[in-house]
Amino acid sequence: MAIAVDYFNLHPEAFRYLYYTPQHGAWFGASPEILLDCDKATDTFVTMALAGTRPVIDDGKPWSGKNLAEQGVVRDYIVDTLYDLGLQPHVGKTETLTTGNIQHLLTRITGHCEGVESTAILSALNPTPALCGWPRAAALEDIIEYERHPRRCYGGYVCVENARSLAAYVNLRCVNFDNAGRWCMYVGGGIMADSDAADEWDETCHKAALLQGLIGGKTESI
């Protein structure tokens, strides 16, 4: 619990969560990525295209073409999916989001969703290309064939719903742990056709660095 609280304190801007289910065990994370936020009273929604990653020390520098293209794929997918549902999304300006020791490219997408169930929007959006690639069906087949480990809850979403609203956040950079002191950390990178393998590895290490620093050598990996 102490490690989770320390991690939460490093991400005050994120959706911070800790949960347990008998089927999936205990998890915690701090997600900056809104998959869907619906206000049921006004029938309005917010989602975002969050992709492209660099260390915070690069703040102020131009974003690389690879990162811009990666984020553009996610943005276009979300917008096209919303149009396919009969919605009229408004696409905001792309900006830089700082979360912990890294930065992402962020485009907020908003609109009205009267007549469309929030669960239908969730099902259509998830998973975005940031989690599974594109085209989605072919990418999911490749993940099933080539990945040697189960993703379990990683890449899904954590959803909080009541009579007034629904908010779902992507389960990114998260940890599965047990009471024996064992931890399994999940992070990922966005690979494009022109990606450099060493750069992608460095990006993944940057994403994992804060969690690794907190967990350190105190525990055993699952």
Regions inferred by a protein language model and the residue ranges of each:
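Contiguous alpha-helical scaffold segments within structured protein domains
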Residues: 46-144, 216
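A glycine-rich phosphate-binding loop feature that marks nucleotide/adenosyl-phosphate handling sites
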Residues: 21-26, 79, 94-102, 157-162, ...
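Conserved hydrophobic core element of enzyme catalytic domains
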Residues: 110-222
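An anion-binding catalytic pocket shared by soluble metabolic enzymes
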Residues: 1-68, 73, 162-188
